[in-house]
Amino acid sequence: MPDPKLQSYIAAHYLSGPKADAILARASSSDIKVKRKKKKVKTDDASRVSSSSGLVFKDDSDTWKTPAEDDEDDGGLTPQVVDGADGQSLNKTFRKIGSASHGAKEAGTSDTASMSTPTPAPTSVEEPTEFKAGLRTRDEMKAARLAREERKKREAASLSVDVSMASSTPAANDDDDQEARLAQQTVYRDSSGRIIDLNAQQAEQERLERLRLEKQAERNTWSQGLVQKQQRQQAAAQLAAVQQQGIARRATDNEYNEYFKQQQRVDDPAMAFLTKKRSAGPSMPKYKGGWPPNRFNIPPGYRWDGVDRGNGYEKAFFERKAQLETRELQARAWGQSDM
C-alpha cells in the first residue's frame, strides 16, 4: 500500500487536475480522523494466582485482546531494531511476576554478568581517503588534504632515495650502458661495404643547404642597383651608431646640425650663392656636354668626340616610345573633347 503522505506531497507539487484534487481531499479527510486510544490489557485471574508462585502463564489466544496499531500512525511501516540489547524485545512481550527480592537477585546477577562479559574493543578509525564521492564535511575535507600532502611527501622521499641510489652507482655501469647502446645501433653500409655515418651525412647536407641559401640571397641582390645597396649599408651603419647615442636631441647637437647642413635641395633659394661642396679625395674627369639618351642613362667617357657609333637601336627605341605616348595622349584628348 503506497504511503498517503507521499501521494499527497506528489499531488501538491507535481500533479494537477481532478486526480490531484481527489488525492488531496482524501489526504485531508484522513488527517481529520481521530486516532483510537490503545486499551490496556487487564490481567486475568490466572496471572493474579500465579503472582504468588513467581510463574508466568501466557496463552496464545489472549493476543486478540491487544489492540493492533493504527495504520495511520506509521503508514504501514514496521519499526526495525538495529542495535538493541538481547533481552529488550523479550521484556516488552513478557512481564515477570514475583517478589521484590527475586527481582533484586536477578538484577544483581545481571550486573555481575555484564561485568564478567568483556567490553568489545572500539572499532579502528578508518584512514581518511584522499578521494571520496558525494558531499563531504569540513573534517573529511581536512583529512583528505592531509592524506594528499602525506602521499606527496612519501613520493618525494622515494624519488630522492632513487636519485641517491642512481648517483652512487659506479662509473663502470655507465660504460656498460654506453657499450650496450652502441651495440644496439644500426650500422648502414653502401654497395662497397663501407660504413655510412648518418650524423656526418646529415651535417654535410645542412652545410650544403646553408651555402645554397646564401647564394640565393646573393643572387636576389644582383638585379638591384648599387645606389640602393649603398643606401642600405649606410642605414645599417647609422643604426649601429644610433644605438650608442642618447635619446635627447638639443639645439647644440653638432652632429645633428651638420647632417641637415649637408642636405641639398633643388628649390633652395640659397643654392645660387652657396659654395659647392667638394668631395673628399681624387675624382675622375667627366664628359662636359650633352649626349643622346640611352636606356640606362649611362654618360659617355670624358674623351668622347660626340660621334654616335651605335647601330641606332637606342634612337629607334626612344622614338617608338615617344610615338606611343603621343598617340595615347591624343586618344584621351579626343575621348574627352565632348565632355
Swiss-Prot record:
GO cellular component, one term: cytoplasm
Ranges where the record places region Disordered: 34-195
A biological process from GO: mRNA splicing, via spliceosome
Domain of life of the source: Eukaryota
Keyword terms of this UniProt record: Coiled coil, Cytoplasm, mRNA processing, mRNA splicing, Nucleus, Spliceosome
PANTHER family: BUD13 HOMOLOG
Membership in a protein family: Belongs to the CWC26 family.
Designated name of the protein: Pre-mRNA-splicing factor CWC26
Organism (species): Mycosarcoma maydis
Organism lineage: Eukaryota, Fungi, Dikarya, Basidiomycota, Ustilaginomycotina
Gene that this sequence comes from: CWC26
